[in-house]
């Protein structure tokens, strides 16, 4: 007999999604799903965008369930008024079995084109490729790839433009990157994208051992294992430098790691920073200003920014 879980659904303004999702992940110990929202690795183009988003979390039916429900209600009451358009509603509660919980979220993920050549395709979806398409097959797992912001998309767009010498990157570097460092690899999608675009040696690190396992499965699925090396090695312990460094993490972490990230960029190399709220652009730029990197481009989508920097040849 399948185990029964409780699904708790909260409808909140879009700007509150990240805060609520982080709280629910910590409270439940499981991933969350977000409806009516553009996801970071797949498209919801069949769902009309809405200023209100539904965040769902999943809890085991046990003695702690009532306390968890109270905690969610208290969190909404305490934090919701800080966000425009918030109206308190009691979370909707539904019972679902384990099989439904494990698979229900997949219906929101569809293939999506990013840039001119990259296409991210969930493993369970069919897709008819066009000539020149580079297909990234991904199974992010319940806790990966279901975030609510376009930081990964912008990173991939910048990645493609660097490798193809397009847009702001045209004529900046004479050759495409050969070596890549992916800091906070998560599902591994950025490393896979770099491999598909032609990188020859990619080092992908994450402090979360579970993320490294999932990334390894996705790398193998895309037949990139001979190019991508995954580990939980701390950034500070890595040696050498790279033609391209990618870091899709929070602004505060980017600034904290600024010196370590900057020193990993080879001359004539790029540093792409994402996971940045637009209001923190200057905070991040100031954090990296001592290290001699030139601003090439800032991409913006919604409330998020992606910054690309370049280290002039010595």
Curated annotation (Swiss-Prot):
Main location class: cytoplasm
KW Methyltransferase (keyword) present: yes
Pfam families: PrmA (PF06325)
Compartments where found: Cytoplasm
Biological processes, Gene Ontology terms: methylation
Known catalytic reactions: L-lysyl-[protein] + 3 S-adenosyl-L-methionine = N(6),N(6),N(6)-trimethyl-L-lysyl-[protein] + 3 S-adenosyl-L-homocysteine + 3 H(+)
Annotated GO MF terms: protein-lysine N-methyltransferase activity
Class of this enzyme: transferase
Binding-site list for S-adenosyl-L-methionine: 152, 184, 206, 248
Cited function: Methylates ribosomal protein L11.
Family, per entry: Belongs to the methyltransferase superfamily. PrmA family.
PANTHER family recorded: ELECTRON TRANSFER FLAVOPROTEIN BETA SUBUNIT LYSINE METHYLTRANSFERASE
Name of this protein: Ribosomal protein L11 methyltransferase
């Amino acid at each position: 007999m399948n185990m029964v879980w409780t699904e708790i659904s909260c409808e909140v303004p879009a700007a509150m999604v990240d805060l609520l999702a982080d709280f629910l992940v910590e409270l439940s110990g499981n991933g969350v799903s977000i409806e009516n929202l553009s996801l970071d690795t797949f498209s919801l183009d069949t769902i009309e965008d809405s200023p209100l988003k539904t965040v769902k979390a999943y809890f085991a039916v046990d003695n702690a369930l009532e306390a968890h429900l109270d905690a969610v209600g208290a969190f909404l009451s305490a934090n919701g008024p800080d966000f425009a358009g918030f109206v308190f509603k009691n979370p909707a509660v539904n019972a679902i079995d384990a099989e439904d919980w494990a698979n229900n979220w997949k219906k929101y993920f569809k293939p999506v084109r990013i840039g001119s050549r990259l296409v991210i395709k969930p493993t369970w979806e069919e897709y008819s490729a066009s000539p020149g398409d580079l297909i990234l097959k991904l199974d992010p797992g319940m806790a990966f790839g279901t975030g609510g912001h376009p930081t990964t998309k912008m990173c991939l767009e910048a990645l493609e433009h660097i490798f193809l010498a397009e847009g702001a990157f045209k004529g900046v570097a004479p050759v495409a990157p050969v070596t890549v460092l992916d800091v906070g690899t998560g599902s591994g999608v950025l490393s896979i994208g770099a491999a598909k675009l032609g990188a020859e040696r990619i080092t992908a690190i994450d402090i979360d051992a579970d993320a490294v396992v999932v990334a390894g499965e996705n790398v193998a699925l895309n037949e990139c294992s001979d190019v991508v090396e995954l580990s939980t090695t701390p950034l500070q312990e890595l040696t050498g430098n790279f033609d391209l460094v990618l870091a899709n993490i929070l602004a505060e972490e980017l600034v904290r790691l600024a010196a370590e990230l900057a020193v990993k960029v080879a001359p004539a190399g790029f540093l792409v920073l994402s996971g940045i709220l637009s209001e923190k652009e200057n905070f991040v730029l100031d954090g990296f200003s001592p290290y001699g990197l030139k601003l090439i481009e800032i991409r913006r989508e919604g409330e998020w920014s992606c910054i690309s920097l370049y280290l002039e040849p010595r």
